[in-house]
């Protein structure tokens, strides 16, 4: 059986990792072993945080809606309950945008929800 020399394959694999590690500080971008560890950790963090980002934005929207709702004398939970009861289907992202950019429109939605 012929001997398999892995020079090209190994170099390609290492260069691929070093390319991913570009921009990391000191040996983390130059030494293969530490670069490999840093890249693995970075990819793990990226995977986790893509899921966490969705939670974080939802929390931000809820905080903004709650703050704006309390200016109009109603809590977040009461507002959401009233919106569901009034069958107003607007998501939290749009509601938060209204609260920040168009306070008059947000007030109109709050009043409409509380009437029902």
Swiss-Prot record:
**Cellular component, GO, one term:** ribonucleoprotein complex
Q: Tell me if rRNA-binding is a UniProt keyword of this record.
A: yes
In terms of InterPro entries, this protein maps to:
Ribosomal_bL20 (IPR005813), RIBOSOMAL_L20_CS (IPR049946), Ribosomal_protein_bL20_C (IPR035566)
The question of whether rRNA-binding is a record keyword is answered with yes
What Gene Ontology terms describe what this protein does at the molecular function level?
rRNA binding; structural constituent of ribosome
Top-level lineage group = Bacteria
Any single Pfam family the record assigns to this protein: Ribosomal_L20
- From which residue to which does the signal peptide run? none
What SUPFAM superfamilies does the record tag this protein with? Ribosomal protein L20
GO annotation terms (biological process)? ribosomal large subunit assembly; translation
In UniProt terms, what function does this protein have? Binds directly to 23S ribosomal RNA and is necessary for the in vitro assembly process of the 50S ribosomal subunit. It is not involved in the protein synthesizing functions of that subunit.
The record's comment on protein family reads: Belongs to the bacterial ribosomal protein bL20 family.
**Name listed for the protein in its UniProt record:** Large ribosomal subunit protein bL20
- Please give the organism: Synechococcus elongatus (strain ATCC 33912 / PCC 7942 / FACHB-805) (Anacystis nidulans R2)
């Amino acid at each position: 059986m012929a001997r398999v020399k892995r020079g090209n394959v190994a170099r390609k694999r290492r260069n691929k990792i070093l390319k991913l590690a570009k921009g990391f500080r000191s040996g983390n971008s130059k030494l293969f072993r530490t670069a490999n560890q840093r890249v693995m950790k970075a990819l793990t963090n990226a995977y986790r945080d893509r899921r966490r980002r969705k939670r974080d934005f939802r929390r931000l929207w809820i905080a903004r809606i709650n703050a704006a709702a309390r200016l109009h004398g109603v809590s977040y939970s009461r507002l959401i309950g009233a919106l569901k009861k009034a069958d107003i289907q607007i998501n939290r992202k749009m509601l938060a945008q209204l609260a920040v950019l168009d306070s008059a429109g947000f007030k109109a939605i709050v009043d409409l929800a509380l009437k029902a």
